[in-house]
Amino acid sequence: MSSVAVIDYGMGNLRSVSKALEQVAGKVRIDVTSNPQRIRAADRVVFPGVGAIRDCMHELRRLNLDIVVAQCAADRPFLGICLGLQALLELSEENHGVPCLGILPGRVQRFDAVKADLKVPHMGWNQAHQVRAHPLWNAIPQNCRFYFVHSYYTVPDETSLVASRTDYSTSFASALARDNIFAVQFHPEKSHTFGLQLLANFLTWNGVS
């Protein structure tokens, strides 16, 4: 039986993510775990996260999961969600600058709260404009709406990494993809039909873009 590890480092939206995966899993086994051996044994890995990046990085290192994340992001289908996307970059300007995992080149910066009428965090439904084809977009229409909750967004060094963009005072990268990695700023587990479709696509994806 195929398996998916959902990484538990104390900051993920674990119940919502696991419940959503279970809805589309079929015969795929869902394992919510912080155990490095069980994570490494999984065929696919989901890296969720909510909260502050400094706490995220502290917990990953405390649990020796930073190395596990890097290993899994290198060799199997890997899905990052929200903070799990941001942690893949090199540096976040949150908390006066926090070094991240450095798996994808780029940085994380805050929305410009000085602009008139711009509410931070960016919270609610917004469109994801697909800028490149990818298996995880299968059966998901262009400009589909997903659910967002975040104050920071990724700025990748390479435009080729961007899989979708979303407008919120600026056009920001709402999904990044490279090889076996697909990572999203929105919450597919809270995005109803098309969020579930993205998760279902992930469970059948072979890790080839």
Curated annotation (Swiss-Prot):
Subcellular location: Cytoplasm
Gene Ontology cellular component terms for the protein in this record: cytoplasm
Catalytic reaction equation(s): 5-[(5-phospho-1-deoxy-D-ribulos-1-ylimino)methylamino]-1-(5-phospho-beta-D-ribosyl)imidazole-4-carboxamide + L-glutamine = D-erythro-1-(imidazol-4-yl)glycerol 3-phosphate + 5-amino-1-(5-phospho-beta-D-ribosyl)imidazole-4-carboxamide + L-glutamate + H(+); L-glutamine + H2O = L-glutamate + NH4(+)
Keywords: Amino-acid biosynthesis, Cytoplasm, Glutamine amidotransferase, Histidine biosynthesis, Hydrolase, Lyase
CDD domains per record: GATase1_IGP_Synthase
GO molecular function, one term: lyase activity
Pathway(s) it belongs to: Amino-acid biosynthesis; L-histidine biosynthesis; L-histidine from 5-phospho-alpha-D-ribose 1-diphosphate: step 5/9
Role according to the record: IGPS catalyzes the conversion of PRFAR and glutamine to IGP, AICAR and glutamate. The HisH subunit catalyzes the hydrolysis of glutamine to glutamate and ammonia as part of the synthesis of IGP and AICAR. The resulting ammonia molecule is channeled to the active site of HisF.
Oligomer status and interactors: Heterodimer of HisH and HisF.
PANTHER family assigned: IMIDAZOLE GLYCEROL PHOSPHATE SYNTHASE SUBUNIT HISH, IMIDAZOLE GLYCEROL PHOSPHATE SYNTHASE SUBUNIT HISH 1
Name of the protein: Imidazole glycerol phosphate synthase subunit HisH
Gene that this sequence comes from: hisH
